[in-house]
């Protein structure tokens, strides 16, 4: 890990891969919360001191030396992650290269369990015959609440029923505020944003970014374009950001995962759809490219796993120009 202060957390793409495998094997997804997680992490590899809390009634002039991480300490989450990783590896799990917070357990060539880590929350599923593995993990890390089949996880509602597994992102959308701008100010579209408006604009772009990553790939271009105005946005840009927040509330973003026909992951394929010029940036200083990664079986059933849009420096005016430039770059 390049940054020794940060802790890997499972990505949204890895969660979709997890759900694709789980529903195809007819497993039940579960979550387990760990009690006092940071106190169960590895010992700190440096000296860290804190001022004792008032409730401890420690004599004045004394400080405490921390042996383990605490909530709020920038090293705390990483130390807990390292402890979890080492324990899983000792139990025979493999850490996946595609996501360092995702682990698999294989016995006699067959996948029997998957665990995804997000700070102190484990998302997991597997063959119930090997539930003893989870018992060993809970002995090492005492667990609190354990839920299965219907629960919330990092902003998603995950629900399993006879149709499959639903990944519902509407809980996040419902919590978003939909701000309004006074009509007089809204009419001054070309005016630069003041400090307060700039703060609001950054907040809205951040909310849109989280929504796009989670479910709303249809607004990826809007996100990239609005992100280019973070340092010099206008009232028109703010109004556009507000409009896009409104769009987030218009649709309930639910992705349904159903079983792929081939049970073995060896029979699945990954393919990528990409568009080198999804749209030109409004400032005329670039365009936007996008790619979407899918998993499919040999019958053609497929699920989008992850997507990303990004700014490209070149600007094109037609499809022919785009294809010609792409050919030249190859």
Feature roles, as predicted:
Residues 16-19, 148-256:
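C-terminal reverse transcriptase regions that engage the nucleic-acid substrate
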Residues 209, 273-306:
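Acidic, metal-ligating active-site segments
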Residues 38-52, 69-76, 105-142, 159-166, ...:
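Catalytic palm subdomain of template-directed nucleic-acid polymerases
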Residues 2, 293-325:
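A short, polar/acidic, helix/strand-boundary loop motif
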Residues 31-34, 258, 266-283, 327:
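Two-metal-ion RNase H-like nuclease active-site motif
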Residues 31-37, 63-73, 97-126, 149-159, ...:
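Catalytic palm active-site di-aspartate
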Residues 80-136, 140-145, 211-222, 299-304:
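Active-site palm subdomain of RNA-directed nucleic acid polymerases
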Residues 1-86, 126-127, 137-143, 174:
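Catalytic-core region of right-hand nucleic acid polymerases
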């Amino acid at each position: 890990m390049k940054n020794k202060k940060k802790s890997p957390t499972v990505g949204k793409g890895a969660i979709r891969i997890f759900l694709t495998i789980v529903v195809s094997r007819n497993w039940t997804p579960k979550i387990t919360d760990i009690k006092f997680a940071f106190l169960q992490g590895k010992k700190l590899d440096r000296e860290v001191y804190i001022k004792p809390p008032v409730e401890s009634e420690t004599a004045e002039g004394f400080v405490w030396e921390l042996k383990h991480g605490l909530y709020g300490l920038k090293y705390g989450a990483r130390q807990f992650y390292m402890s979890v990783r080492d324990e899983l590896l000792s139990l025979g799990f493999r850490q996946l290269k595609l996501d360092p917070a995702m682990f698999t357990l294989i016995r006699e060539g067959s996948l029997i369990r998957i665990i995804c880590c997000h700070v102190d929350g484990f998302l997991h599923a597997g063959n119930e015959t090997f539930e003893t593995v989870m018992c060993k993990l809970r002995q090492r890390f005492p667990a609190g609440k354990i839920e299965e089949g219907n629960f919330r996880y990092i902003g998603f509602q995950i629900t399993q029923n006879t149709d499959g597994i639903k990944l519902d992102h509407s809980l996040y959308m419902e919590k978003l505020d939909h701000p309004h701008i006074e009509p007089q100010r809204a009419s001054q579209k070309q005016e630069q944003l003041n400090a307060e408006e700039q703060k609001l604009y950054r907040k809205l772009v951040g909310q849109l970014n989280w929504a796009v990553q989670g479910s709303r790939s249809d607004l990826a271009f809007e996100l990239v374009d609005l992100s280019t105005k973070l340092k010099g946005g206008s009232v028109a840009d703010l109004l556009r950001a507000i409009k896009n927040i409104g769009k987030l509330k218009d649709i309930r973003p639910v992705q349904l995962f159903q079983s792929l026909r081939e049970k073995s992951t060896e029979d699945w394929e990954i393919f990528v759809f990409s568009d080198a010029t999804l749209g030109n940036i409004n400032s005329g200083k670039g365009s936007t490219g996008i790619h979407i990664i899918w998993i499919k079986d040999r019958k053609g059933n497929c699920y989008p796993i992850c997507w990303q849009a990004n700014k490209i420096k070149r600007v094109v005016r037609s499809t022919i120009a785009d294809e010609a430039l792409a050919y030249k770059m190859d």
